[in-house]
Design a protein with these regions (language model features):
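Acidic, glycine/GT-rich loop-and beta-edge segments that sit at the periphery of enzyme/chaperone cores
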Residues: 1, 336, 343-358, 500-552
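N-terminal glycine/serine-rich phosphate-binding loop of ATP-dependent small-molecule kinases
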Residues: 2-116, 127, 255-256, 260-265, ...
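Glycine-rich phosphate-binding loops at beta-strand->alpha-helix junctions
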Residues: 26, 242-250, 270, 294-296, ...
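Conserved ATP-utilizing enzyme core subdomain
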Residues: 28-30, 197-198, 202, 358-408
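Glycine-rich phosphate-binding/catalytic subdomain of phosphoryl-transfer
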Residues: 55-60, 67, 74-365, 369
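Phosphate/ATP-binding catalytic cores across multiple sugar-kinase/actin-like superfamilies
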Residues: 75-83, 273, 422-452, 499, ...
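Glycine-rich phosphate-binding/hydrolytic loop that grips phosphoryl groups
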Residues: 130, 275-279, 328-334, 338-341, ...
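Activation-segment/catalytic-loop signature of the eukaryotic protein kinase fold
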Residues: 381-479
Length: 552
C-alpha cells in the first residue's frame, strides 16, 4: 500500500530511497520507505521552463535548460530530507529516476551540455526527417527498404519528426561546431545520472527510445546497421544498463549540491512510458493504463513486440525483461488543461486560486486547486458539452495519426455556448483521444486482455469528475490508485526494490499498489458520447488539408 505522511520515526527494518519524477514542466521528488509496502514519507515539487518556438529561435523548437533540471532536483531533495528529520541522508540507500523520454541531451567529455537540450516535443527537424526516411516509395511515412530494416532490427521505425534521431541530424546540419563537440548522446534522466555520478550511461528503455537499439534476442545493444543507415556515429552512444541496476555512486561534488551522502547508490530507473504503468500497478500481461500528464498515452503490457506503423504505435522495451509496453501517445494531454488556466479562464481561475489557495502554495498544491476549480465548473454542464467538441492537438499529434500540422479547435460553437461548455469540452476532448488510441490498440492486443478495466493515472486522475467522464466515454470501469500524480516516483522506487532484491520481479509490485477508487460507466451518457466521438474523429480527416495550409 502507498501512504503519504511526513512525521514519524525511522523503521529499522525498512530501506529508504529518494526518487525523481522528471516531467515536462516540473520535477516531483519523493522520499519512500520500502518494507512490506511502499510508503511515500514526503514529497516536493519544483517547476522549470519549457522554451518553445520563438524562444528557441526555430519554428517547432521545444527546449529546456539542463541546469534548471539539476537545480530543481537539488532543491527538492533537500526539502524532502528536511520534512523527514528521522531519516538522515546516510540512511538513503539509493536514488532513482523516472523521466520524460526521447529528449536529446548532447554532452562533451567533461559532461557539459553542448547546447540546450531538445525535448520530445521538438519538431524542428522536418527536412532531416524527409531526407532521412520520408521519401521515395513509402509505407506509414517511411521509405520501404529502410522501414523493413528498422523493423528487422529494432521492431519500430523512426518516422516521426519528434524522434531524437532527426534532432541529432538537425544539429549536424545546422550547428556543425556543436556537433564536433559531441562525446555522448544522452536522454533527460541519463544527464541527471551523469551529473550525480559522473557515469555516461543509458538504460535499455531509453536506448530503445532512440530507435537505434537492436531488440533481437541475443543481439541486444546499439544496432550498427541502423546507425549506419541513418548516419549516426555509434561512438556517440553511451554504455547501456538495466533499469534495476546500480549504475554508479553519488560523487563528492554532487553530494554537497544535493544534500545527500557521498557514495549513495544511483540506480538506472526508467522513462515515464516504462515506469508510470509500473507505479499504477499495470504490470501483468494484458494490463492497460491511461496516463494524463503534460502529455498522455495509452499503454498495454504485452509479451511480444507489436508494431502498428500506420497508427505510430509500437511495443516498446520497458523495465521488465519479460514484457513490452504497447504504446500510443498524445502530445498535449493535461497541457490542454494548462492552456485553459493560462488563456481561456485566466481571470476566473485566478480568483478561485486566491480564494482557496495562497501565495505560498507549492507547485503541486496549485495543481490540486486547479482541479478543484475544474470539477466545480464542468459539473454544471451536461455530458457532451451541449454539442461542443474540442481537439487536443495543441502541439501537433503522433497517434493514431502523425501530423505536426494538426492543431486544437473548438467545433460547433453557437450563440448560447458559454465558457463553461468550452472548458468541459477540453476535458472530454482529451478523453475522446484516449478512446481513439485505446480502440486502435485493441485491434492488436485484445487476445492478451483478461479484463476491460483501465488504470487511470497522472495529474488528470486527480479530478473525480474527469475520472467519471473517462469511464463514460470508454464505457468501461476506470480504477485509480492512491496518489496518482506520484506514480512515476513509485515506479522508480520499484527499480531500486528489484535491484536490491527486496522484491523478486516487477510483477510483484502490483500487490503493493491497491486500487483506491473504481468508476463505473454511466450508461445514460453512452449515446451522446458515441455521437460526439464520431464527430471528433471526423474533424481531423475533414481538416487535414486546412491544417497543412495554415501550419505547413
Amino acid at each position: 500500500m502507498i501512504y503519504i505522511y511526513v512525521a514519524g520515526k525511522a523503521n529499522t527494518m525498512a530501506k529508504y530511497v529518494i526518487t525523481y519524477d522528471i516531467g515536462t514542466t516540473g520535477i516531483k521528488t519523493c522520499l519512500i520507505e520500502i518494507d512490506e509496502s511502499m510508503k511515500i514519507l514526503a514529497s516536493s515539487t519544483a517547476g522549470y521552463n519549457l522554451y518553445v518556438d520563438d524562444e528557441t529561435g526555430v519554428k517547432g523548437g521545444a527546449e529546456q535548460d539542463a541546469d534548471e533540471w539539476w537545480e530543481a532536483m537539488c532543491t527538492t531533495t533537500k526539502t524532502v530530507l528536511n520534512k523527514t528529520p528521522h531519516v538522515t541522508k546516510e540512511m538513503i540507500e539509493g536514488i532513482s529516476f523516472c523521466s520524460a523520454m526521447q529528449g536529446l541531451v548532447l554532452v562533451d567529455k567533461e559532461g557539459n551540455c553542448i547546447r540546450r537540450p531538445m525535448t520530445y516535443m521538438d519538431q524542428r527537424a522536418r527536412e532531416e526527417l524527409k531526407k532521412g526516411i520520408a521519401h521515395g516509395v513509402q509505407v506509414a511515412g517511411a521509405e520501404v527498404t529502410k522501414l523493413l530494416k528498422y523493423l528487422r532490427y529494432t521492431g519500430a521505425v523512426s518516422s516521426s519528426v519528434k524522434d531524437p534521431i532527426w534532432k541529432y541530424k538537425w544539429v549536424e546540419a545546422h550547428e556543425p561546431e556543436n556537433f564536433k563537440k559531441i562525446y555522448k548522446w544522452l536522454d533527460i534522466k541519463e544527464y541527471l545520472i551523469l551529473r550525480a555520478s559522473g557515469e555516461f550511461v543509458m538504460t535499455q528503455d531509453s536506448a530503445f527510445g532512440t530507435l537505434l537499439y537492436d531488440t533481437r534476442k541475443g543481439h541486444e545493444g546499439w544496432c550498427n546497421p541502423v546507425c549506419k543507415m541513418v548516419g549516426v556515429n555509434i561512438e556517440h552512444m553511451p554504455t547501456i544498463k538495466k533499469s534495476t541496476e546500480e549504475v554508479g555512486k553519488i560523487t563528492e561534488k554532487a553530494a554537497k549540491e544535493l544534500g545527500l551522502a557521498e557514495g549513495t547508490a544511483v540506480y538506472g530507473g526508467g522513462g515515464d512510458a516504462s515506469l508510470i504503468g509500473v507505479g499504477a500497478g499495470a504490470v501483468e500481461i494484458g494490463d492497460t493504463h491511461i496516463y494524463s500528464g503534460t502529455s498522455g498515452w495509452v499503454g498495454t503490457v504485452v509479451p511480444e513486440q507489436i508494431v502498428d506503423a500506420g497508427a505510430m504505435m509500437a511495443a516498446i522495451v520497458g523495465v521488465d525483461p519479460e514484457a513490452y509496453n504497447y504504446f500510443g501517445e498524445l502530445e498535449t494531454s493535461n497541457k490542454c488543461v494548462s492552456w485553459v488556466k493560462d488563456h481561456l479562464a485566466l481571470d476566473e481561475i485566478g480568483v478561485f486560486l486566491k480564494k482557496y489557495g495562497n501565495a505560498s502554495d507549492s507547485f503541486e498544491q496549485v495543481e490540486f486547486n486547479l482541479y478543484d476549480y475544474l470539477e466545480e465548473v464542468i459539473d454544471t454542464i451536461p455530458a457532451g458539452s451541449n454539442g461542443v467538441v474540442f481537439t487536443p492537438w495543441l502541439h501537433g499529434n503522433r497517434c493514431p495519426f502523425e501530423d505536426p500540422n494538426a492543431a486544437g479547435m473548438f467545433f460547433n460553437i453557437r450563440l448560447e455556448t458559454g465558457k463553461t461548455e468550452l472548458i468541459r469540452a477540453v476535458v472530454e476532448g482529451i478523453c475522446f483521444h484516449m478512446r481513439w488510441m485505446l480502440e486502435r490498440q485493441e485491434q492488436k492486443v485484445s487476445k492478451y486482455k483478461k479484463e476491460d478495466t483501465v488504470r487511470f493515472c497522472g495529474g488528470g486522475a486527480l479530478g473525480e469528475t474527469t475520472c467519471q467522464i473517462l469511464s463514460d466515454i470508454l464505457q468501461r470501469d476506470v480504477v485509480v490508485v492512491e496518489s496518482p500524480q506520484n506514480i512515476g516516483a513509485v515506479g522508480a522506487a520499484a527499480c531500486i526494490a528489484v535491484g536490491m532484491k527486496l522484491i523478486p520481479t516487477m510483477k510483484d509490485v502490483k500487490k503493493l499498489i491497491p486500487v483506491k477508487t473504481t468508476y463505473h460507466p454511466n450508461k445514460a451518457n453512452k449515446a451522446v458520447y458515441d455521437r460526439n466521438f464520431q464527430v471528433f474523429k471526423n474533424l481531423y480527416k475533414d481538416n487535414k488539408k486546412n491544417f497543412e495550409i495554415l501550419n505547413g
